[in-house]
Amino acid sequence: MKLFLYHTPELTPTDKAPECAIAVDVLRATSTIATVLASGGEAVQVFSDLDRLIEVSEKWPHEKRLRAGERGGAKVAGFELGNSPLDCTPELVQGRRLFISTTNGTRALQRVQDSPNVLAAALINRAAVVQFLLDKQPETVWIVGSGWEGSFSLEDTVCAGAIAHSIWQQTQLSPEEIAGNDEVISAIALYSQWQDNLLGLLHQASHGQRLLRLDCHEDLKYCSQTDILDVLPIQHETGVLKSQKK
């Protein structure tokens, strides 16, 4: 198994696909997706285009759908939800499909949607993602960070490092043996330095600071936790993620 890290969707190769692709948007799309499914949501369907989201979701009964839209960190007008995982309570999402479009995370998922196995990872469900990789042993794994509008992000990189670090710790393989590119080595180093203060790292990240200015302090606290949700969001059909059954 070789892990490759791409800091933004635009950096992924266009002439091939991996056996397994993992989209990461710690702040906050993949954290929200994991939370919705852990709270009993039927599925999460992702869109890059808001108009397309509205068109598709209109075909669902009102009581069976929720619309989540975020642009620039703020909720899209007319949608029930923005991109805060803390809003996704079991009382709200149980049995419903979440139709979601965000600034960055949904683009990452759409970029890798043709891979045989597509997962959504965040710090909060890291262990479930790692267990899938250890069980399935895919030959090539792409971890694709969402970044922020095409730029590198600390929070997605440290999550990739958390995944790679856990695989390193649970196998007899060295970091050099599991790393397919230098980005993985640097991500492991970042996680190793900050693993005991991930909230502090998120506070230093540019998108973390952006969310703090929007008074999303509790979101950062929640998203900085590791392994609190035993849920694996996996693509069942193009653009539709459901919880992997145990």
From Swiss-Prot:
- Name the Gene3D superfamilies for this protein: ComB-like
Q: Does the keyword Cell inner membrane apply?
A: no
Its catalytic activity?
(2R)-O-phospho-3-sulfolactate + H2O = (2R)-3-sulfolactate + phosphate
Query: Which SUPFAM superfamilies does this one have?
Result: ComB-like
The EC designation for this entry is 3.1.3.71
This protein's cofactor list reads: Mg(2+)
User: Which key words are in the record?
Assistant: Hydrolase, Magnesium
The enzyme class is hydrolase
Q: Name one GO molecular function term.
A: sulfopyruvate decarboxylase activity
Query: Which HAMAP family does the protein's record reference?
Result: ComB
State the family named in the UniProt similarity comment for this chain: Belongs to the ComB family.
Protein name (record) = Probable 2-phosphosulfolactate phosphatase
- Native organism is Nostoc punctiforme (strain ATCC 29133 / PCC 73102)
Name of the coding gene: comB
